[in-house]
Amino acid sequence: MPENRHSTEIILLELIEHQQTKVLKVAREIVPNATPEDIRNPQDFPDLVADTLFNYEDGILTGYLTLQTAIRKQTRTDNPDL
């Protein structure tokens, strides 16, 4: 099982990195000088908050990050000595 968990974590990291790139690309179509930090705080940019595509892609990223947190918590619960 640890091998499966490790490969799952690698795939999830790849998905997160891909989605972060995608969210930044969409953000830069709306706010050309947007930075990775800016997309973590979109409320500072009304045009981002109002854009449905940005919110959709950001929601996917949020889901991946939530899954990553859940997997890490489960790993710690299953293996408290790690």
Place the predicted regions along the sequence by residue.
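Short, charge/polar-rich alpha-helical segments
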Residues: 1-28
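Short acidic DE-rich linear segments
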Residues: 2-3, 77-82
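Alpha-helical coiled-coil oligomerization motifs
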Residues: 24-27, 31, 35-38, 79
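Short, charge-rich amphipathic interface segments used for partner binding and complex assembly
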Residues: 34-76
